[in-house]
Structures are given as C-alpha cells and as structure tokens.
C-alpha cells in the first residue's frame, strides 16, 4: 500500500467517523428530549395520583350523603329506582328495584 492509498483510507475513515459522530450527536439530542419528557410525565403522574387520592377520600362522604337523601325519599313513600323514579309507592309497598339501589355495597 503506498502513501496515497494510506492517506485516502485514513481520509475515508475520518469522514466515516465524522458521519458517525453526527449520528451519535443526533441520538444524544433525541435521548435528552425523551428523558426530559419522561421526567415531566413522571411529575404529572405523581400530581395526578395525589389528586386522585384526595378525590377518593372525598367520594365516600358525598356518596353517603346522596344515598341518605335517596333513603329519605324512599321512606317518605317515593320510588328512587330508575324505572319509577319520583312516583309514589302504592300503600308504601316495598320495591325490589329501590331496595337494590339503596342497599347495594
């Protein structure tokens, strides 16, 4: 191999390294963007989990109040089931649909 061939091979190798370096820089930039997005999503997820915990603590109280209101209406002689909602119960007869709604767990 003469000096010119050696120089050309070294020049080609240098160009290949520059192209590879550019590709590595592009991958590095893309990775940085993905990591930043991942961090942002983790923070948002943590905030949403905290908020969900707060909402779950509030929900049983609201549900209990709503169910108590429905029971009061039922004991006042009205249907609270979806089929007959608001209609008066004849002779205060039991309604299995209302009972299921009021006493389900």
Curated annotation (Swiss-Prot):
Subcellular location: Cytoplasm, Nucleoid
Entry-linked InterPro entries: YabA (IPR010377)
Keyword terms, alphabetized: Cytoplasm, DNA replication, DNA replication inhibitor, Metal-binding, Zinc
One GO term describing the cellular component: nucleoid
Pfam families reported for this sequence: YabA
Signal peptide annotation: none
Cofactor list: Zn(2+)
Cofactor binding annotation: Binds 1 zinc ion per subunit.
Keyword Glycoprotein annotated: no
Gene Ontology biological process terms, A to Z: DNA replication
Residues binding Zn(2+): 79, 81, 95, 98
Quaternary structure, from the entry: Homotetramer. Interacts with both DnaA and DnaN, acting as a bridge between these two proteins.
Family indicated by similarity: Belongs to the YabA family.
Function: Involved in control of chromosome replication initiation. Inhibits the cooperative binding of DnaA to the oriC region, thus negatively regulating initiation of chromosome replication. Inhibits the ability of DnaA-ATP to form a helix on DNA; does not disassemble preformed DnaA-DNA helices. Decreases the residence time of DnaA on the chromosome at its binding sites (oriC, replication forks and promoter-binding sites). Tethers DnaA to the replication machinery via the DNA polymerase beta sliding clamp subunit (dnaN).
Protein name: Replication initiation control protein YabA
Source species: Streptococcus sanguinis (strain SK36)
């Amino acid at each position: 191999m003469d000096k010119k061939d050696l120089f050309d091979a070294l020049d080609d190798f240098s160009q290949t390294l520059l192209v590879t370096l550019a590709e590595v820089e592009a991958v590095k930039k893309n990775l940085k963007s993905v990591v930043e997005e991942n961090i942002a999503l983790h923070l948002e997820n943590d905030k949403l989990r905290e908020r969900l915990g707060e909402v779950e603590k509030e929900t049983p109280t609201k549900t209990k109040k709503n169910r108590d209101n429905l029971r009061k209406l039922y004991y006042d002689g009205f249907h609270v089931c979806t089929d007959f909602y608001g209609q008066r119960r004849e002779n205060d007869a039991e309604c299995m649909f209302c009972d299921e709604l009021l006493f389900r767990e």
